[in-house]
């Protein structure tokens, strides 16, 4: 029997009087964490979680604007709710996140049926903003603000693995990226507040935490204090040591890293600290130094390769994942081929790929040397095929190995299988054998013998 723990949040928010809510989240892990926090606020206010988006009394879209396709998807979703609003005037429509920040009042002109538009920095102020809506106002909250600590318990989508934001915003100015203009300047949370949230997760039987930041290696640069060696007193490395002793937490992850700031000291900490998983997500974006310079990334391919070498020197079986952009303005066929070569040479476990998409208020969007759409599609197709092949080849190293898998639940497509992840973040499906006594709970770590390795997942059997 597979048992699931009950979270305290589920006990607290039983009585609801304000109707139901629905949240759809687009984009990154930061958005997912923000959505969990907003869901917690809504349930604290008295809303209950709807089971049908088209019957919810409050609909919130937490949006992404990193690519145009994500932006257009939001407008498509909004169209359905606008029709509902005309027949159900009491319906509250909220657009949060990066698109809300980017468009501001112009979004209200495009979709006048909206009740609330709020940028990412206002996530912790949702209750006050909705109170203004209840007074009959249409509210636009996109002004830059200090992100205060929120004492609301997030409504977690998982009962085992929790997202914990440790730094908001980004001070980098990559020429293609809209994030700094929509998420604002870097704001680090204090270590005590982060540890307190992780302790709360442990109290609620969570077993894994993922520390989040748009540029997580920048954590602590804006906090006071320096050591006698002259470095900042608070860094991601220091934070990992600080939270490592939280009882009940078995695994710690962090994302997303920037090669410009990824240090040997951090690598050493990951090697020394047992709970920190051997999984590193470090975007490289391009395999060509000239393109990296035009992107304003602040590092070279040679430096990136040294980082990977340093990781693998201490942790040979570590999982390395990355992001890559193809068809950046001016990218030649030769430069593009260097990106393919880098993927083959390093042997990534996985690479998240995208064709360049011009974003508002970014330098690269105004350059004349944009790549034709048909070339973008060809390059994206080719790189994706390479990534799939490379990932499948890389995953063969797990075959017949005994891997520790943290159980997250049942496979929604096959209830005869559990699913979980290895320390290296490989999604793993585990057969529930009828011939073996089975008595595990969500959050248990079990030994699994890997019997099948695909490009992006593994399968195996319980090993006793």
Curated annotation (Swiss-Prot):
SUPFAM superfamilies, per the entry: Radical SAM enzymes (SSF102114)
InterPro entries: Elp3/MiaA/NifB-like_rSAM (IPR006638), Methylthiotransferase (IPR005839), Methylthiotransferase_CS (IPR020612), Methylthiotransferase_N (IPR013848), Methylthiotransferase_N_sf (IPR038135), MiaB_methiolase (IPR006463), rSAM (IPR007197), rSAM_horseshoe (IPR023404)
Obligatory cofactor(s): [4Fe-4S] cluster
Alphabetized PROSITE patterns for the sequence: MTTASE_N, MTTASE_RADICAL, RADICAL_SAM, TRAM
Domain (MTTase N-terminal) ranges: 19-135
Span of domain Radical SAM core: 156-393
Domain of life: Bacteria
EC number in record: 2.8.4.3
Reaction(s) catalysed (UniProt annotation): N(6)-dimethylallyladenosine(37) in tRNA + (sulfur carrier)-SH + AH2 + 2 S-adenosyl-L-methionine = 2-methylsulfanyl-N(6)-dimethylallyladenosine(37) in tRNA + (sulfur carrier)-H + 5'-deoxyadenosine + L-methionine + A + S-adenosyl-L-homocysteine + 2 H(+)
Principal location class: cytoplasm
Binding site for [4Fe-4S] cluster 1: 28, 64, 98
Alphabetized Pfam families for the sequence: Radical_SAM, TRAM, UPF0004
Positions contributing to [4Fe-4S] cluster 2 binding: 170, 174, 177
An annotated Gene Ontology molecular function: 4 iron, 4 sulfur cluster binding
SMART domains named in the record: Elp3 (SM00729)
Domain TRAM: from-to ranges: 396-464
Gene3D superfamilies: Methylthiotransferase, N-terminal domain (3.40.50.12160), tm_1862 like domain (3.80.30.20)
Function according to Swiss-Prot or TrEMBL: Catalyzes the methylthiolation of N6-(dimethylallyl)adenosine (i(6)A), leading to the formation of 2-methylthio-N6-(dimethylallyl)adenosine (ms(2)i(6)A) at position 37 in tRNAs that read codons beginning with uridine.
Subunit: Monomer.
Family designation: Belongs to the methylthiotransferase family. MiaB subfamily.
Protein name (Swiss-Prot/TrEMBL): tRNA-2-methylthio-N(6)-dimethylallyladenosine synthase
Organism: Prochlorococcus marinus subsp. pastoris (strain CCMP1986 / NIES-2087 / MED4)
